[in-house]
Amino acid sequence: MDSTPAPMAAGVAPTSTTVTPSGTPSASPGTPAAPAVPAVAQDLKLTQYVDPMIGTDQVPPLVPDIANTAPEDLLGGFTTPAATMPAGMVQWGPDTPSVPNTWSPPGYHYSQTSITGFSLTHLSGVGCSAGGALPVFPTVAGQSGPAAFKHANETARPGYYGVTFDNGIRTELSATLRSGIARFVWPAGQRGQLNLAAKTNAASWGGSIAQDPNDPQALSGSMTGGSFCSSGQTYKIYFYARVDQPFTAKLGSGSAQLTFASSSGAPSTVNMKVGISYVSVKNAKDNLAGESGTQTFDQVAAQADATWNQALNAIQVTGGSAGNLKKFYTALYHVLLAPSVFSDANGDYLTMGGKTANAGKDRIHYTTFSSWDTYRSLMPLMAWLKPAAAGDMMQSLVDDAGTCGGAFPKWVEGNTSSDVMPGDNVPILVAQSYLYGATGFDAKKALSIMLDTASGAVTACKGVTALPGLAEYQKYGYLPADAFIQVDSSHSGGTASTTLEYATTDYAISRFAQALGDTVNAAKLLARSANWKNVINPAAPGSNGATLPRLSDRNSDGNWVANSFDEIEGNVEQYTWMVPFDIPGLMGVLGGDAAVVPRLDTFNAYLNAGSKSPHLWIGNEPAFATPWLYNWTSRPDKTQALVRRILDEQFTTAASGLPGNDDEGATSGWFVWAALGLYPEIPAVPGFTLTSPLFPHATIRLGNGKTLAIDTDHPGSIYVKNAALNGAPLTGTWIDFAQVSNGGAITFGLGDTPSAWGKSQAAR
């Protein structure tokens, strides 16, 4: 929790320690001894545990009695096995046909058995058309795609992707930050051919390809990208490509066909390098030269592996099963894919206004902000592990607001702002980042943007309204259903759940303002965050004619909408629990411990129920905080059991191993936190609610150079018997960020049956 107490309950459970007169915590009997805080350990070989195929297939079907689902519910993880770097601008990977008879965005789908090409840009885990820049397809004269393949002939690992088509043509891909490298091999006696198309998944028109007049083995051009989730906003992607073998070229309108000489006695190999830029062909060429240079394919792939291994060593977990190690490091890999680099090697980038700017010395401008999703899990982790990069990310958003109309953008892809999901969620990202240690950005300017948007002084970014219905929200204290407010580009309903989103943002801004010393606005927005109470119907219809308090849509006259059920990607029962910033207040409204615990038990009977069932849907972000709510009741052991069930059952090592869209690492971020036994439950209140860790030991290398060790005494057990921080007992289920921001040691004593740990009212 921030150092200045909030005027109302923040929803955190205080921790208890025994403190000696000198102020040094001391251990008590029955508490596991704290290990010495370790020195920075040597790097482990961690890329071996990453499987980029996890999440590339559809979510397994729901159980029959809750299978009345919406199409969204069975969407896959939508991850990509593309070769890329942490935060890479280039993600060079395979594309397949879409999945028949179901919605599936362009990209790679594990269930498909053919590949249409290898494009240089992808987004990981999103459910809208994106990426697909400059697809390259290796073939031979007289043949066209797609090409059949088998997964047995396919390999994906960090920074590398390889596949052999059934026709014998082999493709290998790797990447630097802003460029890609490919190695194509044709069977002996075949004349290899590469087909290139200057297009993206946003548009198949408007592209151009030309040979470099000064280098007959080089090509350059551009194509139109953007229009993410049908935003209509577009941009240009520029490329410069070079192959290491001579070719004859057939250039068309936005296409190129390169034909190479055959080799009669041995397979023929062509290496191709491509740099991209959102500014110019020259910058694309410079990106390629500066990052790839004269390196061979194997050298680039080795460097990518080394870079990924270093990034993954930010968290070292040991002692777990091979399956759990694979799940953990694949999740951490997915977390590190975005936000992604948008500025060139020289610092140039394309502003939201369409002009060229420069990020400045030693700074990077970022894009790919899935804000509605990632504020709940990814951004606190990024700020804790990589505060300098997270600071650049937040400065990127501040700069974006300055060139797009004054408000923060929403879903940022390239230099576009898409109106995909409801709420003004970037303020939560910014507040989370700052309060978890990423302070290297213009925080005062960020607060000014937040306050101007919250008051209505500024309203939009690139024509996308930040807070639709703000006037009604200010007047009524909620968004009235009969005002028919278009809360985002896809929804005109969901006013009750969107009210919760607005209140969450109000709370986050209030905590950010408090941290910056603006106590007046902190108090105002803290008071406004209590608007969540205005959409809790105290007598909503329940089963067997009974009533119960539950989220409901409400009209402007104050009356509740009859049979209120559907909300934004969820329903009223699922959203009733989404008040993470005032959990004690929510518990009180819902009837206290005696009412909440059995209701949560019923709610959690199913773990991934979809949007049409009044149960937990862990595959979608509004549910991320719900499994931890037992920690604010007399039964924290139920959080321990529930979180472990989710880790074991809903996340697997299969291609279908994610419970829903990964949304640029949001779902994977939840797994990382839960496996460590921590979760940043309360937006903009830095700290963690606790559960039993998945691994016997973890070492977290913090961004400030310190380390935090997390240890358990009985690996495999679920229930917490006792816990300690630096040897001092923890009797509660919450620790403040300040207690671990400079490292230390958390130890858990675990058992196979529930204990009394954390159950008392004082521990919450």
Q: Could you tell me what each predicted segment is?
A:
Residues D2-A39:
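Ser/Thr-rich, Pro/Gly/Ala-heavy low-complexity intrinsically disordered linkers and tails
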Residues P35-M379, A383-I428, Y434-L500, A513-N534, ...:
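Accessory carbohydrate-recognition regions in carbohydrate-active enzymes
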Residues T505:
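ATP-dependent phospho-/nucleotidyl transfer catalytic cores
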Residues G542, A546:
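Active-site cradle of extracellular carbohydrate-active enzymes
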Residues Y719:
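Extracellular attachment/recognition segments
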